[in-house]
Every structure is written in structure tokens, then in C-alpha cells.
Curated annotation (Swiss-Prot):
Similarity comment: Belongs to the UPF0220 family.
Location of Phosphoserine modifications: S2
A GO term from the CC aspect: neuronal cell body
Main location (coarse class): membrane
GO biological process: late endosome to vacuole transport via multivesicular body sorting pathway
Sequence positions bearing N-acetylserine: S2
Keyword set includes Transmembrane: yes
Gene of this entry: TMEM50A
Keywords: Acetylation, Membrane, Phosphoprotein, Transmembrane, Transmembrane helix
Compartment list: Membrane
Name of the protein in its database record: Transmembrane protein 50A
Pfam families (UniProt xref): UPF0220
Lineage: Eukaryota, Metazoa, Chordata, Craniata, Vertebrata
Amino acid sequence: MSGFLEGLRCSECIDWGEKRNTIASIAAGVLFFTGWWIIIDAAVIYPTMKDFNHSYHACGVIATIAFLMINAVSNGQVRGDSYSEGCLGQTGARIWLFVGFMLAFGSLIASMWILFGGYVAKEKDIVYPGIAVFFQNAFIFFGGLVFKFGRTEDLWQ
């Protein structure tokens, strides 16, 4: 059985290894922007509190803080490869990263709760604000993962 991509010609002269950080950063930025764009769109379409409770923006703010916390710690600091110990050293970096991931997963779970508890279970006519809250948090979460694990730190080796 042959693959369906065998006929696709891809130039071997493109070196994606050197552009990995650039591509990962752009992809993470697009995901982050898309998440906030979706929730801003929902807030503009449904400005009343009856259709869209604007306290639901807290999930996106917490996801953004988690995005920043996760990416503030380098992989070298978590592994203990850094040259200076800093304030708390490797243990502090791991705790910081753990709290960041807890906030990220918590905001994603809370956005699902908002979608299903606030819109689907109540059988509201308008479900788009709940979907927007979920997709905002999902895009920010996956953008944070791409930005954290899609880049390399060994630029000079």
C-alpha cells in the first residue's frame, strides 16, 4: 500500500532545523492571537450580560498568566543545567513550572465547565460565547505548549 504523499515533491535544500525556533514562535503567536481574537469577537457580538457573562474572561486571563509562567522557565533551569542557582534553584524552577501547568490545565477545565454548565446544560439558544471561551483557552494552552517545547535552547552548539 503506497502513501498518498509519495507524489508530493519537497525540496531537500530547505533546512528546517535552523528555522525551528522561528517557526515554533510564529505558530505559538498565531495560536495565542487566535484565542484572544475569538473571545473578543464573542464579546463584541454579545455585549449584554444576559448572553455572555463577561466574568468568563477570567479564564483567558489565567491562561495567559499560565502561558507566561510556563515560558519564563527554561528547560535548562528545570534540568539543573543553568550556571547560576538563583533564588530557589532547580527546585524553584520546577515548582514555578508546575504551578504554571496547574493554572493552564485549570483554566482549560474551567472553560469546559463554562461551556457545558453555562450554555449546553441550560439549553440556551446562543452557545457561541461558551464555545468561544473554550477555544480561547484551548488555543492559548496549545500555544504555550508549542512555545515551550517547540523551540530549542542549543543555538551555539
